[in-house]
């Protein structure tokens, strides 16, 4: 191993940026983390062991990658910025079980990538990422839509988004994203991260969120998962409006349809005037199923 300071130290980060002439790119939402304690705490929160395969999304200059390499069996780092690939390959060269590829995770065939790039694809697959704020939700949705069974997804994100992921019904943060996560995973905020530990410093603080597969199955299953979440997004399209007004936007104002919607709400004992954020995931599934039975969805 090299005697150089760890990549995540502020001095080494600045040295790497100077050596390679790196300027962070706003278009990729780049902010480099420069606090070794935070980096080590992320690895701990993700519960990385030598038996794990880790996919890291957006390694930047390799600060978190280095910490993951010291704990995991293998690390596959997906970096969208082609200019950083030679930098990563050089600074991470002391680690044999790290592979860096130029890849947009949203365009990746994740099952194929796992099969092709890991020496032992049968080991638990964990995702660890410092996600660009502007694309956090699409990346999370992409991971959850994948057929891969993730052992853990541990991501750094804007604190406000983290609060939405872990929100409870009836709160202003609760919404379609909360429900999409809850459908498959259990979410918890591991710890907050100050904006001051990044180069350059972002405008907001961050939080580390850990997602693990649900241990208790949903008591009711949707007639169609994709249609369920299209329906839920429609119900949250106008948050200040009642469920009834949102339902009319989703289903229409045809008198026959309105009569069926009224009957369904009565049957499920849901007030038409309730706000969508008051409904639980189970209630949304029951409502979608009942509307489907009436040929409204």
UniProtKB/Swiss-Prot annotation:
InterPro entries, alphabetized: KsgA/Erm (IPR001737), rRNA_Ade_diMease-like_C (IPR023165), rRNA_Ade_Mease_Trfase_CS (IPR020596), rRNA_Ade_methylase_Trfase_N (IPR020598), rRNA_adenine_dimethylase (IPR011530), SAM-dependent_MTases_sf (IPR029063)
Pfam family, one: RrnaAD
One annotated Gene Ontology cellular component of this protein: cytosol
Keyword Cell wall biogenesis/degradation: no
Subcellular location: Cytoplasm
SUPFAM superfamilies: S-adenosyl-L-methionine-dependent methyltransferases
Catalytic activities: adenosine(1518)/adenosine(1519) in 16S rRNA + 4 S-adenosyl-L-methionine = N(6)-dimethyladenosine(1518)/N(6)-dimethyladenosine(1519) in 16S rRNA + 4 S-adenosyl-L-homocysteine + 4 H(+)
Keyword Repeat: no
Top-level taxon in the UniProt lineage: Bacteria
GO molecular function: 16S rRNA (adenine(1518)-N(6)/adenine(1519)-N(6))-dimethyltransferase activity; RNA binding
SMART domains with a match to the protein in the record: rADc (SM00650)
Enzyme Commission number(s): 2.1.1.182
Residues binding S-adenosyl-L-methionine, per UniProt: 31, 33, 58, 79, 104, 130
Gene3D superfamilies found in the cross-reference section: Ribosomal RNA adenine dimethylase-like, domain 2 (1.10.8.100), Vaccinia Virus protein VP39 (3.40.50.150)
Record keywords, A-Z: Cytoplasm, Methyltransferase, RNA-binding, rRNA processing, S-adenosyl-L-methionine, Transferase
PANTHER family found in the cross-reference section: DIMETHYLADENOSINE TRANSFERASE, DIMETHYLADENOSINE TRANSFERASE-RELATED
Family to which the UniProt record says this protein belongs: Belongs to the class I-like SAM-binding methyltransferase superfamily. rRNA adenine N(6)-methyltransferase family. RsmA subfamily.
Cited function: Specifically dimethylates two adjacent adenosines (A1518 and A1519) in the loop of a conserved hairpin near the 3'-end of 16S rRNA in the 30S particle. May play a critical role in biogenesis of 30S subunits.
Name of the protein: Ribosomal RNA small subunit methyltransferase A
Organism: Limosilactobacillus reuteri (strain DSM 20016) (Lactobacillus reuteri)
């Amino acid at each position: 191993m090299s005697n150089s300071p760890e990549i995540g130290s502020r001095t080494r980060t600045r040295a790497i940026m100077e050596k390679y002439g790196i300027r962070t790119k706003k278009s990729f939402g780049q902010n480099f983390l420069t606090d070794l304690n935070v980096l080590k705490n992320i690895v701990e929160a993700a519960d990385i062991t030598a038996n794990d395969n880790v996919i890291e999304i957006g390694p930047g200059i390799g600060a978190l990658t280095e910490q993951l390499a010291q704990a995991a069996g293998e690390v596959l780092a997906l970096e969208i910025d082609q200019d950083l690939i030679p930098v990563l390959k050089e600074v991470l060269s002391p680690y044999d079980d790290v592979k860096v590829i130029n890849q947009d995770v949203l365009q990746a065939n994740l099952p194929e990538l796992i099969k092709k790039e890991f020496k032992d694809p049968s080991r638990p697959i964990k995702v660890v990422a410092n996600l660009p704020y502007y694309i956090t939700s699409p990346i999370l949705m992409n991971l959850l839509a994948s057929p891969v069974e993730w052992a853990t997804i541990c991501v750094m994100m804007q604190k406000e988004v983290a609060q939405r992921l872990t929100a409870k019904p009836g709160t202003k943060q609760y919404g379609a994203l909360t429900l999409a996560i809850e459908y498959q995973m259990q979410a918890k905020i591991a710890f907050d991260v100050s904006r001051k530990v990044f180069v350059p410093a972002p405008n907001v603080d961050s939080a580390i969120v850990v997602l693990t597969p649900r241990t208790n199955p949903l008591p009711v299953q949707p007639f169609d998962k994709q249609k369920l979440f299209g329906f839920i997004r429609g119900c949250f399209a106008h948050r200040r409006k009642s469920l009834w007004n949102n339902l009319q936007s989703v289903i229409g104002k045809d008198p026959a349809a309105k009569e069926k919607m009224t009957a369904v709400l009565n049957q499920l004992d849901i007030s038409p005037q309730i706000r969508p954020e008051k409904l639980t995931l189970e209630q949304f599934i029951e409502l979608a199923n009942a509307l489907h039975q009436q040929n409204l969805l």
